[in-house]
């Protein structure tokens, strides 16, 4: 937790422990600003933050009251009007800068990573190194093993100080950005130490700086309280006479003091156990900069803010660990290697967990302290700030950043944006600070000269130990670096086929040509400025500058360094482009022991939890009242974080470390089996109960009156009765018995089953030991029973149905009953008969068919019964419930299914499959009928002799449709004229072939006229072969052969007229006495309906008559009648011929 109101006072007075220094490096330019480097922020810890800026202008320091951050770097931006000069020869961005404008200095609002260790080491890069190969590990508490004494010095910096630095370039013109990759280096920073005096085993008493207090290392190790006392004394020292730094008109940094080293005894190691599975993440967010566009302007110091909130399970123990993961493309710090995360503390300053950072995996591992053993229901939140890792992201791109708390991930899409070079004419340049080494007091700057690879003439580059404006003019002021012959200046040439990373950060200089030696005679120094004469160039160059700086008189960092490029145009005029980088520091305070002003007093709250036997809400009014142990009490801080304790054996609890003026909330967990007692039962605040939750504000004193009382919750019963409702009226009658062994289930208001029982021999059931509340009772229907009607009468005499709700309110509830009656059973079946007349109706003369298999299926299609008809054709299925069924009849062999649904349900045939629904009654209407098919054969063979000429006229009616083709040879002349009309109700198709010259085709309602002219001898032999097919509702196939032989001795002319009219309707075989012998073979086939007809038994329709079957006999009669008529006319013609002779 951060005490924002006391931030300035904390900075001015006393020692502040657990404070981290953060540095942001600013780029000042007309219209642009950029910041490098990132840090982490963790709630509850302070940090000291530094900014680096570029360009000239007066600045007003602005204090920011950020709460908790970890190695955060932020930069102020100065935006001026700019114009763009297009140059397509290089992919680097172009930025045009106009007049320089004053820029207000901003101090970062985000705190940096808190150092856990008391001894911080720093690494310095004085020569080009391949940072890619470095593996900088978090610093450790080396002081615990050092044989050194502790020296507390008045006016020195707080311990555990981390410096985190970022850079911002500046110049006058914006051009295309470079596209070559860039790298990032982390440097662990430490403030300059005062010149040490050689002192062994001494501690300087802060109250008397001139007289050291002799304390041995062993004494400090064995007596940590002594160390705390020394620190406390130093914190209480009056610093009022110490001059306070006044912010100048340009830059007013705060003091960054030398580190103090303490030898502290380390606790015994505790076995580590990852408990990520016991960490519940409640909220995670990722925000880039202001969160409006998700653009990470890496040179403008736009940070990536990761916020996470989580709870710590009560199973977590001291020594257990959890993890926080950064995305692989970000780093907590850009200019330093100080990536050690600060401790997670609660608002009172107690440490919950200590963290270490693994640079290779970019993972923080937090180890829990004994805080988790003392407190319960801990809620924590963490805010981590990081920055784009220029080593893994050398150029502008789009990323999907992923962070994770305890393995639970969240992601955000981000666009990475880098700065533009400053351009004016052919002059184009850009620069950033890349590394800060506070131990050696050096700062590294990397400069891109002519990154656009223009053809520049008379090129000179100035490196100034102060800011420069956009015209290259040096602006003297605070924070000057030292630029002289001892300044390390390296120059590298970029080949034409190489592209500079847009990140403006080089990690491996070996890939470029080192041309430093070429400038031995082209480099001059004057007035803290180095000038390099490049002459006429068309290539890009990199300058790496490592310069010394001198801290300000109060020990704070104030670093500024500028660079400018000047060229001449074709008219001989100079074009300037400049960048400035500078660093300033600001202080942020956070949670922890060191963040509290020495003079600030902390307070406590608490008191007592008791069992209020008489429920009056007043303590001590009943001798049976007693304290309640192990009651969970939770304190919620103003920032929403919580911690919990349990009452001791005397019912007491206490929370300390609370601040005056702050408002807190205390909540009491109601113990199982108890209820909260009456609130404010008396005006005596020391004796009343404050209820389950109370809010309190600290008003300059402790508050030990926050009490609460509970009483045991009474228990109740619920239940009643299950009976057989024989008359089905839903009312419990005196003569109706209970039903035993009925299952009853009890559920609470959430639907959770809390009990199951069965009724006893008298139908009674009961659930006991129940609290007030709403319950649900479910009755299981007994086998063979049906639920009766419900809610028909008074509550204690009716049936509540299968499911009912029961309410207990300070009394038993014995009114939940349910009634059932025995479920009736039904039968299904009827009759299978021989339908001799095929009309689909059961006639009295028609008999049943025995042994027909009948199958019964339920609604799911499952076979539930199979039977056979008895000798009378009867069948039945019994013991059936109401429902849907299907009856399937198996067709007997040799029989045909009769027509279905021709009359009433109980007299018709229902077909091979019948669907039926039983609803509270039997159904004996499911019948089916079958009949046997007819078949006939006849052969006809005739032989006749005739000797005559005849004229024949015949008229016949026929119910058939036939095609006839006959051919005959004869030694006589005959004329035949036949006229026939045919009208039939059926269609018959017959085909006959005969050897004659006549062709006859007749159809129903047809008029045919045929002429036959034949010449026959008295001796003739005729052979007739006809084949006819008839197809209607029946199939008829007949085959007849006719052989006739006639002799004649003369040739005569005869004119005879005979009329033959035959009309026959016959269903029989006939023989005729003549000289002809007829043998015919005919087959008759009658089509039948399918054997299985599936339809609803209660929806029958009468079938239409089968006309073709009924009229087949008439067709046969007509055919035979026609043959007899022909024979008769031949005989008659023969007699007349003989008479003429």
Swiss-Prot record:
Keyword Thylakoid: no
Region described as Ligand binding A region: 53-601
Membrane topology: Peptidoglycan-anchor
PROSITE patterns: GRAM_POS_ANCHORING
Sequence motif: LPXTG sorting signal, positions: 1104-1108
Domain of life of the organism encoding this protein: Bacteria
Xref: SUPFAM superfamilies: Bacterial adhesins, Hypothetical protein PA1324
Record-annotated disulphide pairs: none
Region (Disordered): 54-225, 899-1117
Extent of motif YSIRK-G/S signaling motif: 23-34
InterPro entries: Adhesin_Fg-bd_dom_2, Adhesion_dom_sf, Fibrogen-bd_dom1, Ig-like_fold, LPXTG_anchor, SDr-like, Sdr_B, SDR_Ig
Residues where Pentaglycyl murein peptidoglycan amidated threonine is found: 1107
Bias type Polar residues, positions: 158-207
One GO CC term on file: extracellular region
Limits of the CNA-B domain: 602-714, 715-824, 825-935
Protein family per UniProt: Belongs to the serine-aspartate repeat-containing protein (SDr) family.
NCBIfam families linked to this entry: LPXTG_anchor, YSIRK_signal
Protein name listed in UniProt: Serine-aspartate repeat-containing protein E
Organism: Staphylococcus aureus (strain MSSA476)
């Amino acid at each position: 937790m951060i005490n924002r109101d006391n931030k300035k006072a904390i900075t001015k007075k006393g020692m502040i422990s657990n404070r981290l220094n953060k540095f942001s490096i600013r780029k000042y330019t007309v219209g642009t600003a950029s910041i490098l480097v990132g840090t982490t922020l963790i709630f509850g810890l302070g940090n000291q933050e530094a900014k680096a800026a570029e360009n000239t202008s007066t600045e007003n320091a602005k204090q920011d009251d950020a709460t908790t951050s970890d190695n955060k770097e932020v930069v102020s931006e100065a935006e001026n009007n700019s114009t763009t000069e297009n140059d397509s020869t290089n992919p680097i961005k172009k930025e045009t800068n106009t007049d320089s404008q004053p820029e207000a200095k901003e101090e970062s609002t985000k705190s940096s990573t808190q150092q856990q260790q008391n001894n911080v080491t720093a690494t310095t890069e004085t020569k080009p190194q391949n940072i890619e190969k470095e593996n900088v590990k978090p610093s450790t508490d080396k002081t615990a093993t050092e044989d050194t004494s502790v020296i507390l010095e008045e006016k020195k910096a707080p311990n555990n100080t981390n410096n985190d630095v970022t850079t911002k370039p500046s110049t006058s013109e914006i051009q295309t950005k470079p596209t070559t990759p860039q790298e990032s280096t982390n440097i662990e920073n430490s403030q300059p130490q005062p010149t040490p005096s050689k002192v062994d085993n001494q501690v300087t008493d802060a109250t008397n700086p001139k007289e050291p207090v002799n304390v041995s290392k062993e004494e400090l190790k064995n007596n940590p309280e002594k160390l705390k006392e020394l620190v406390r004394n130093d914190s209480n020292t009056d610093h009022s006479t110490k001059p306070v730094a006044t912010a100048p008109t340009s830059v007013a940094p705060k003091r960054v003091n030398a580190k103090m080293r303490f030898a502290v005894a380390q606790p015994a190691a505790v076995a580590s156990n990852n408990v990520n599975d016991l960490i519940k993440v409640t909220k995670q967010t990722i925000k880039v900069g202001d969160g409006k566009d998700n653009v990470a302007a890496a040179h403008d110091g736009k940070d990536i803010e990761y916020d996470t909130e989580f709870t710590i399970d009560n199973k977590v123990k001291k020594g257990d660990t959890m993890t926080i993961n950064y995305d692989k493309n970000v780093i907590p710090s850009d200019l330093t290697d100080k990536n050690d995360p600060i401790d997670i503390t609660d608002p009172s300053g107690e440490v919950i967990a200590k963290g270490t950072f693994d640079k290779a995996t970019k993972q923080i591992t937090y180890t829990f302290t004994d805080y988790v053993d003392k407190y319960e229901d801990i809620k924590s939140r963490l805010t981590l700030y990081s920055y784009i890792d220029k080593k893994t992201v050398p150029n502008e791109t789009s990323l999907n950043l992923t962070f994770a708390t305890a393995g639970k991930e969240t992601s955000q899409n981000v666009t990475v944006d880098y700065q533009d070079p400053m351009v004016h004419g052919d002059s184009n340049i850009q620069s950033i600070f890349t590394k800060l080494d506070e131990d050696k007091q050096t700062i590294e700057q990397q400069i891109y000269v002519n990154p656009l690879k223009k053809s520049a003439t008379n090129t000179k580059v100035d490196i100034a130990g102060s800011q420069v404006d956009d015209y290259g003019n040096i602006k003297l002021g605070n924070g000057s670096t030292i630029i002289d012959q001892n300044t390390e200046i390296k120059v590298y040439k970029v080949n034409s086929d190489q592209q500079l990373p847009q990140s403006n950060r080089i990690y491996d200089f070996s890939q470029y040509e080192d041309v430093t030696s070429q400038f031995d005679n082209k480099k001059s120094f004057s007035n803290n400025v180095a000038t390099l004469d490049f002459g006429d160039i068309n290539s890009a160059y990199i300058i790496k500058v490592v310069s010394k700086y001198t801290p300000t008189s109060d020990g704070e960092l104030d670093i500024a360094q500028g660079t400018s490029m000047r060229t001449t145009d074709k008219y001989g005029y100079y074009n300037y482009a400049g960048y400035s980088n500078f660093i300033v520091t600001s202080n942020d305070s956070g949670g922890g022991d060191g963040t509290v002003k020495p003079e600030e007093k902390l307070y406590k709250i608490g008191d007592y939890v008791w069992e209020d036997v008489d429920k009056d809400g007043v303590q001590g009014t009943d001798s049976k009242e007693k304290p309640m142990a192990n009651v969970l009490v939770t304190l919620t801080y103003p920032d929403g974080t919580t911690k919990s304790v349990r009452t001791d054996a005397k019912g007491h609890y206490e929370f300390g470390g609370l601040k005056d003026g702050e408002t807190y909330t205390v909540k009491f967990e109601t113990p199982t089996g108890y209820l909260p007692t009456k609130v404010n039962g008396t005006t005596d605040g020391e004796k009343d109960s404050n209820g389950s939750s109370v809010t309190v504000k600290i008003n300059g004193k402790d508050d030990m009156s926050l009490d609460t009382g509970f009483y045991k919750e009474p228990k109740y019963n619920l239940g009643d009765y299950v009976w057989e409702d024989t008359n089905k009226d839903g009312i419990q009658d005196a003569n109706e018995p209970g039903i035993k062994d009925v299952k009853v289930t009890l559920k609470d208001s959430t639907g959770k089953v809390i009990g199951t029982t069965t009724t006893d021999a008298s139908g009674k059931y009961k659930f006991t030991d129940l609290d007030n509340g709403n319950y649900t009772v479910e009755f299981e229907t007994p086998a063979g029973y049906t639920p009766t009607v419900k809610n028909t009468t008074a509550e204690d005499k009716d049936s509540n149905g299968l499911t009912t709700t029961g309410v207990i309110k300070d009394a038993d509830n014995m009114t939940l009953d349910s009634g059932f009656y025995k479920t009736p059973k039904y039968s299904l079946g009827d009759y299978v008969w021989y339908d001799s007349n095929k009309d689909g109706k059961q006639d009295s003369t028609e008999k049943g068919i025995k042994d027909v298999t009948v199958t019964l299926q339920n609604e799911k299609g499952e076979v539930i019964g199979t039977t056979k008809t008895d000798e009378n054709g009867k069948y039945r299925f019994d013991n059936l419930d109401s429902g849907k069924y299907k009856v399937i009849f198996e067709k007997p062999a040799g029989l045909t299914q009769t027509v279905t649904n021709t009359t009433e349900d109980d007299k018709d045939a229902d077909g091979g499959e019948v669907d039926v629904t039983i609803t509270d009654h039997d159904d004996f209407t499911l019948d089916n009928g079958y009949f046997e098919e007819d078949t006939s054969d006849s052969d006809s063979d005739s032989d006749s002799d005739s000797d005559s000429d005849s004229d024949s006229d015949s008229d016949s009616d026929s119910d058939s449709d036939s095609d006839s083709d006959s051919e005959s040879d004869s030694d006589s002349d005959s004329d035949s004229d036949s006229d026939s009309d045919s009208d039939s109700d059926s269609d018959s198709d017959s085909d006959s072939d005969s050897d004659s010259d006549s062709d006859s085709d007749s159809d129903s309602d047809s008029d045919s006229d045929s002429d036959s002219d034949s010449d026959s001898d008295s001796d003739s032999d005729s052979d007739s072969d006809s084949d006819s097919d008839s197809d209607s509702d029946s199939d008829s196939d007949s085959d007849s052969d006719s052989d006739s032989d006639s002799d004649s001795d003369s040739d005569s002319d005869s004119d005879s007229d005979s009329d033959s009219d035959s009309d026959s309707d016959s269903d029989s075989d006939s023989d005729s006495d003549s000289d002809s012998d007829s043998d015919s073979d005919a087959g008759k086939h009658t089509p039948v309906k399918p054997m299985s007809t599936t339809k609803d038994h209660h929806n029958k329709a009468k079938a239409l008559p089968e006309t073709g079957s009924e009229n087949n006999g008439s067709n046969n009669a007509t055919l035979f009648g026609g043959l007899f008529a022909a024979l008769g006319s031949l005989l008659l013609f023969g007699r007349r011929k003989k008479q003429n002779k």
